[in-house]
Amino acid sequence: INWLKLGKKILGAL
């Protein structure tokens, strides 16, 4: 799992 990409997706959803 790519945590950096996942984090960016989460931040983008906020």
Curated annotation (Swiss-Prot):
Report further notes: Most of synthetic analogs show a decreased antimicrobial and hemolytic activity.
Give one GO molecular function term.
toxin activity
Q: What does this protein do?
A: Antimicrobial peptide. Has activity against both Gram-positive and Gram-negative bacteria (B.subtilis (MIC=15.5 uM), E.coli (MIC=70 uM)). Shows mast cell degranulation activity (EC(50)=15-26 uM). Has moderate hemolytic activity (IC(50)=45 uM). Its mast cell degranulation activity may be related to the activation of G-protein coupled receptors in mast cells as well as interaction with other proteins located in cell endosomal membranes in the mast cells.
Biological processes annotated in GO: defense response to bacterium
Its keywords, alphabetically, are:
Amidation, Antibiotic, Antimicrobial, G-protein coupled receptor impairing toxin, Mast cell degranulation, Membrane, Secreted, Target cell membrane, Target membrane, Toxin
Expression across tissues: Expressed by the venom gland.
- In the record, Leucine amide modifications are located at 14
Compartments it resides in? Secreted; Target cell membrane
What do the Gene Ontology cellular component annotations say?
extracellular region; membrane; other organism cell membrane
Q: Know the name of this protein?
A: Mastoparan PDD-B
Which family is this protein grouped under? Answer: Belongs to the MCD family. Mastoparan subfamily.
- Superkingdom, natural source: Eukaryota
